[in-house]
């Protein structure tokens, strides 16, 4: 794989190393500009001479929402793996062409609140998706720099992600 790992906070000096300061920094960012930065990253990879044009996206928290937004915006996207990210609007789901592998944390009430409507839209539009709900986990369970980190479930989710990418991108 060729990877591009943009730091959404780079315009403010980059990720500060902890979630509390990171959340404060996120409040200072122009969300539309930030999303366009990620879209530009997709276009850079898609048009790069060294890629096969099979582009996948994986994102965590806000980046999970970016993965859903990329799936809506780019029919060329080959695979999308949002980890506990905000969902696409139901009316936008018909535009999704890429397969989705969605990871959710059972205790993440804020993100999970939107899942039933999103899943219904995915089903109604016959989209290719697989969703996993990780038991007794909280939002951010894959982030090993926080107390919410759950090594067992993080490893399982990552194994599933690599298998998914091998299937759709290799």
PLM regions with names:
Residues 49-60:
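Alpha/beta-hydrolase fold nucleophile elbow
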Residues 59-63, 67:
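Gly/Ala-rich beta-loop-alpha elbow adjacent to hydrolase catalytic centers
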Residues 123-170:
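C-terminal catalytic histidine-bearing segment of alpha/beta-hydrolase fold enzymes
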Residues 1-46, 143-145:
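Serine-hydrolase catalytic machinery in alpha/beta-hydrolase-like enzymes
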Residues 107-112:
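Acidic catalytic loop of the alpha/beta-hydrolase fold
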Residues 96, 101-104:
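Short beta-strand/loop motif that positions the catalytic acidic residue
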């Amino acid at each position: 794989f060729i990877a591009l790992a943009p730091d959404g906070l780079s315009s403010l000096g980059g990720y500060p190393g902890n979630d509390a300061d990171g959340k404060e920094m996120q409040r200072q960012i122009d969300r539309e500009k930030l999303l366009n930065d990620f879209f530009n990253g997709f276009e850079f990879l898609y048009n790069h001479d060294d890629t096969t044009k099979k582009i996948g996206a994986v994102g965590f928290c806000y980046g999970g929402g970016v993965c859903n937004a990329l799936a809506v915006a780019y029919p060329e996207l080959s695979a999308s793996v949002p980890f506990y990210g905000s969902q696409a609007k139901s009316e936008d789901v018909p535009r999704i062409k890429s397969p989705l592998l969605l990871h959710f944390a059972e205790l993440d009430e804020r993100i999970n609140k939107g899942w039933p409507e999103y899943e219904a839209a995915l089903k109604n539009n016959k989209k290719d998706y697989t969703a996993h709900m990780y038991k007794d986990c909280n939002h951010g369970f894959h982030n090993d720099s926080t107390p919410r980190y759950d090594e067992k479930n993080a490893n399982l989710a990552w194994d599933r992600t690599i298998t998914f990418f091998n299937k759709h991108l290799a």
